[in-house]
């Protein structure tokens, strides 16, 4: 289909993939029209090749695949080719629609070779005669604006003018809307996003296609307009083309003629005539067109009302006939829907009509199609993998493809095809008859079928779990097979609960049969739904079957007790139970959550009886300890512990106590459901011995192997020694015939290891011979060869030569031992095969060592000596977000760090988290009485008396509306830790930060602006956050009351305490919330106190109304618990001590500096430096010229080591300096600059006191030119005396304000002169929020660019050219650029926090080395005030002083004792804690 485009001809195109104006993929509309019919026909055939048997675990690049496109409704099957792989995702190019798709391996199948022929000719294109406005890279705004125009256009035309080296067509692209037609190049130029380029040669780099620019294969995302356009066009064109089919090729025509001229009569049964619509059979001809069967249907189905029902029955009957099976094995028909008018239903059969053909035109055979008057069959609500075939009972056509025609031809002529045997076809795809029958049965299933019980789950589904019980367990395939009741079934239907998990199909029928269950599986695997439907169904059955026994009917207590680990899970599971029973009307309490009511209310509810009691260990212990009979053992049916391991880690003693009380009331004899993450052999066996009909269900095969007595052996050695170690392990087996499996990481490692083992005399087999493996042969497998499971399940020795990418895959490897795991109920202990595994670790996967050791320790397995590198490796991991947010993390497979480091403490430059800082904030949310989310508004540092507003770039109350309106909704991809994105939360867009991105579909994010809680969302729900919102600081801050815990058991907070805090802080509009920071860690502020203040404006003071810490202790809601923050307190005290030592030694460190020019000279001793510092003399008044080097008493220390230590100390000193500047930023801003005479004197002093002889000589010559020759003798002494006087005057001291040279060169790196270029004169002025530059220009034309922190200005038209480069201190953006004559005014606005803005440009170094850059001292002073204004201000000050005895500075300086009011409680803590 290669077509050379005419450079002089415009053609209508469709753009399917747009990267930038110079790179997009397009296809001609005529090509889409010509190939639409074949594309649809191939897509209908793809469904036969998408069975579960044909799936693969890994696909390689350039492999042709079948893709399930989820974003189409319903999902459709398309063809694609793999371009790249990244972890579990694949980047696939869709062949027939021309775009990249990011999809998972579960949406891919191999594409057969005979269906891989390319049909559409997609080309690479670009807009000619255009270039980016600046540079060679297109800006994001240019790409988005043109992309939007192209998507909204009604028609696109393209005229090729040049072909690039990479076969990319550059031409004139025009888009036509309803009102006008515009050229793409002109559009970019008008938008100031492109510039005209006259040359046709486009040396534009080809941007690599990445996952970020690909479409995401998720049904929750709508199809983009450009993709929807081509998809709908293919469907429409194929339907319009059904009236005529293409003429077969010459070879196929000969085969058809030979078939039709055959004298053998090809008998077709009547049933096939009905399904294939064969009109008649004669000795010499056979019609394959559709015929009207309305007469036949009218004879067989006289009642029109039952037509649809009978049609379904007949179709199923015909599909099950033996004659049809025999016929379909030879003739395979593919059908698709036809659309005709109703008038054609009464027309008779028509003959085939063909038109004349020639070699250069498309030849089509016209065919009249008919539509019967019968009603259409109702389709199933969800039919997987059959979306592309729209089956209608009365609208079918028969199309013979090339392969099908060849098969008929070979059958009729008695030929035996060599390469297309029936066995090969059956091995490549499922039987068409069986699959068609199955699909029709699924379509006919519109209600709950009673025959579902006859179907058995697939073998692979059984192998996904390990189920052990005294009696065989019969799993189900659907919840509809269970007697759950209509209420539960309807609720499950509302949830669209279609495919149950393997653990659920075993747990449901066992619980229905009154059995007990121990389920071992990780969290997030649907464990709760393995028992919830059955529990709720049993509760509703008890409500319906009211007993006649009065004692049982009025018995108190619940029918089921559900014990969870946290308040959050209690709320979640209670809502699940309420949803399942929502349609059942009863006066009884169906669900009671003890954490949603006060304990007194809970007691009353239990006395009146209820259905399901959802509680925690602490509350259940109180209920069972109560004197009232709140739980009746005769009424109780279920006891569920979810999750056992989390309860054990939280409070093992309380868990043991609750088990004893439950056992004392006979609760363990009831139906027990115990959900855990780990197998605890001793404890669980005792529980199972007391239960009836126990079932142990494992979804985690690693835990199942430990249940079977697996012996762990873990080693950590160099990768070079692993092969030798493996040979030693195999030699230690003493010839015992153990079936051995060795896992490798990839194919290359497998081949290398196989060669080593064969060379050592061992026999190796691959995965293809897994079923016939003998014990003396080693089977080698790599992860890429394995799909979900291997066909072997009798391995005795499992060796992990390398670890997989995730812990989930590592756990799945142990399924190969499933058949050798002995059943605890049927086989005596001591029998069976020993299971052994070896994990060979090296430096490549050493980071998993701590996790494996922790896993072994949690299971009570002995571990040998651990390497010293464990702590170091563990410190590289990020801190666990769940532990930081909730205070604990009970996830068994958590791979995050659970201990704090010094690096977790806040930087000194962040005053909000410094000890002693007072913060006035706005209350957002209370998660518990000691954990809240607030929005800081003002703060005052510990040693300051000034309140400073928190500098938010955007007003907080309007930020949420700005984010919700006018922001493009694009899915954020890929998801990385700490990425900022949007999520739809409470009907508004909210900023969130990704804190955990596990291998599961859900991503853990944390709110940033109006809360700090963690949310579990799907990756498709994360939206792209524009850059203007991405860099804004977080509005919400997490605060915790340090050293305080709930008064309940295990430190839990009571419901009353939570309710009291919410009521107290819900409406504090007239009060101010003030917190006192104790210390901070990882953006969480641990506070000493949370106070509510009421201001008294008339008295110029304020009153403390509530101290939260004292109120919680006074009312008995809380207790002192300092153990929870001992680790944090110790790290903070150590860090505080280091900072104090740095402050004490600051002067010594500064005075220990040496000259930069004499870096290689001998370093003086530490004693000499201290003496120099104590005498008050400085070697160099300009610290910019001198680097900081710490003198070490160790003479063997190298210069590089000293330099490293000096840099480390200097960074800490700089942080201290920045902190002082941030606290007193207003004083720094108001400091008046030095006058010119003082600057000149300081410069001369610096030059004369330097160690460089050349500088001294040049300075003396300069002074000689100013003063007389006879006065030069005393100049040096006079300047020295001036030095002492300047040091005594604190107002003109310059040294401490100047930055060190290293920092100055880093912050202000002015461009050096290059050839004949010069600097323009620039005036600099800065405020707290802005920087203003005034540039003297020689020409009105200039170029100004801002890249990050670098500002570049250049004028190339002048001779010599002008330019300068400024590397600014912080990130800025250009606010305005104005031209006033030959002066260019540039205004820059700071981005981010405003208290990191030190002033550097009034230093001597700038005036000396950047002579072209001067500080605008006149503007910093401002115009002098008028005399009248001065008098008026003096009068107001005098009047104010006379009226009030105290000044305004003492407004908040009073202690709580100074304004005690009757009936108000105050905290008995240090008074300076609340001092403002």
Swiss-Prot record:
It is found in: Cytoplasm. A motif (DEAD box) lies at residues 642-645. GO terms for biological process: germ-line stem cell division; primary piRNA processing; secondary piRNA processing. Its EC number is 3.6.4.13. Involved in primary piRNA biogenesis in germline cells. This is Putative ATP-dependent RNA helicase SoYb. GO terms for cellular component: cytosol; Yb body. InterPro entries: P-loop_NTPase, RNA_helicase_DEAD_Q_motif, Tudor. It catalyses: ATP + H2O = ADP + phosphate + H(+). Residues 292-313, 339-364, 415-436 are annotated as: Disordered. The keyword Repeat applies. Residues 297-313 have a biased composition (Basic and acidic residues). A motif (Q motif) lies at residues 477-505. Residues 8-117, 929-1043 form the Tudor domain. The gene is SoYb.
